[in-house]
């Protein structure tokens, strides 16, 4: 068990003390870090993610489910992403309580393992699903004609299931790790195995996905830029969307993965000098925790960029809101048959018709990524 002495400055000993010699780890295996330095920032950010992410992802899940039922391929990835985000957000209050309670976990080791498992799975499921979304858009835009007969919902479901299964298996060793009585997954003392794991996470969990996102979004914008049927404003809209996708990815995930890389590199540099490694990790503790927390902001940014920020989603939300107002009015106000017939054309017009000069009269609104003609691309991508 790790000790938990805390001084007035909020410094807490992490590691194994000589109190429990049965662990066969000497007392020098302790590092001193400050929990108080990051407490306020972590609580504020996690609280904001919970308050904003819950309604945003609930609405996103509903909107994308409607598109899934209409056989939309891209919506499958977005729906899976929103479900994963909702599962993670449901555990955020536990982290807030843990941090506010000076990093003391009172819910038992199994609850700690499940919560941590969901936390880390969500990070990498989100990253890989974002890559799937960008690749699907890339195929739908750059190879619109060639991919038309090859993009199927069944394929999207299979890929999403494989992503979730792969990440789940990679993180499954979490359940085999020993969890201390009062702590829940505090940073472990660096060793060669953990350093190698950090290198792999940086390479396959960040660097390669970043390359995929940058390449696909650049190619999408390049393809749109060459189109003669789009206005400058429409092209700029696609450009801003592509830049936003890569920027949010960098802001949310780059800091934490860079810290992982630095930690692993420091272990290699000090060549097993545990005192030096411990001192270095202690200095990085606050930064590491803040950057890990920052990665969860992705749970709020993704639904806004990919779904809620699109023109069609705003129209759908407006339609639902108008329909709700109409239903509420009919619930409390009884109208005569003649009155209903008189106002029916107006009600239908206000509720269900969304004039759009880009669509021929009587056409249906474009789905999220299904229609890929040059005239419809900006609406799909933005």
Swiss-Prot record:
Residues 66-76, 136-155, 222-241, 310-382 are cytoplasmic. The keyword Hydrolase does not apply. One of its GO terms (cellular component) is plasma membrane. GO terms for molecular function: G protein-coupled receptor activity. Disulfide bonds join 112-184. Highly expressed in hematopoietic tissues rich in lymphocytes like spleen and thymus. Weakly expressed in heart and lung. Highly expressed in infiltrating macrophages within atherosclerotic lesions. The keyword RNA-binding does not apply. One of its GO terms (biological process) is G1/S transition of mitotic cell cycle. Its main location: membrane. Residues 1-42, 100-113, 176-198, 262-286 are extracellular. The chain crosses the membrane at residues 43-65, 77-99, 114-135, 156-175, 199-221, 242-261, 287-309. Gene3D superfamilies: Rhodopsin 7-helix transmembrane proteins. Glycans are attached at residue 11. This is Probable G-protein coupled receptor 132. It comes from Mus musculus (Mouse).
């Amino acid at each position: 068990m790790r000790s938990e002495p805390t001084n007035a400055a909020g410094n807490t000993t992490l590691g194994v003390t000589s109190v429990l010699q049965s662990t066969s780890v000497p007392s020098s295996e302790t590092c001193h870090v400050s929990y108080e330095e990051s407490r306020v920032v972590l609580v504020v950010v996690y609280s904001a993610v919970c308050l904003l992410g819950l309604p945003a992802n609930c609405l996103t899940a509903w909107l994308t489910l409607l598109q899934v039922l209409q056989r939309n391929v891209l919506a499958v990835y977005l729906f899976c992403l929103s479900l994963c985000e909702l599962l993670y957000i449901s555990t955020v209050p536990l982290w807030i309580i843990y941090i506010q309670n000076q990093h003391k976990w009172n819910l038992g080791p199994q609850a700690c393992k499940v919560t941590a498992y969901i936390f880390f799975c969500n990070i990498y499921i989100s990253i890989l699903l974002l890559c799937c979304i960008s690749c699907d858009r890339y195929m739908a835009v750059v190879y619109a004609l060639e991919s038309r007969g090859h993009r199927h919902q069944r394929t999207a479901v299979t890929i999403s299931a494989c992503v979730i299964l792969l990440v789940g298996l990679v993180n499954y060793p979490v359940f085999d790790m020993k969890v201390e009585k009062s702590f829940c997954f505090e940073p472990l003392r660096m060793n060669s195995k953990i350093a190698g794991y950090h290198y792999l996470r940086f390479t396959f969990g960040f660097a390669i996905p970043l390359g995929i996102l940058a390449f696909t979004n650049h190619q999408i914008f390049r393809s749109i830029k060459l189109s003669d049927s789009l206005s400058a404003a429409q092209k700029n809209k696609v450009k801003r969307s592509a830049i936003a996708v890569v920027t949010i990815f960098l802001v949310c995930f780059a800091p934490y993965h860079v810290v992982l890389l630095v930690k692993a590199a420091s272990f290699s540099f000090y060549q097993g000098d545990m005192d030096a490694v411990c001192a270095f990790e202690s200095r990085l503790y606050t930064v590491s925790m803040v950057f890990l927390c920052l990665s969860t902001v992705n749970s709020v940014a993704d639904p806004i960029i990919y779904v809620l920020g699109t023109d069609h989603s705003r129209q759908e939300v407006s339609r639902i809101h108008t329909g709700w107002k109409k239903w509420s009015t009919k619930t409390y106000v009884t109208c005569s048959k003649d009155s209903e017939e008189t106002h029916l054309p107006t009600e239908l017009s206000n509720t269900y018709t969304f004039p759009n000069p880009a669509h021929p009269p009587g056409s249906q609104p474009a789905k999220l990524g299904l229609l890929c003609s040059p005239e419809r691309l900006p609406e799909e991508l933005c």
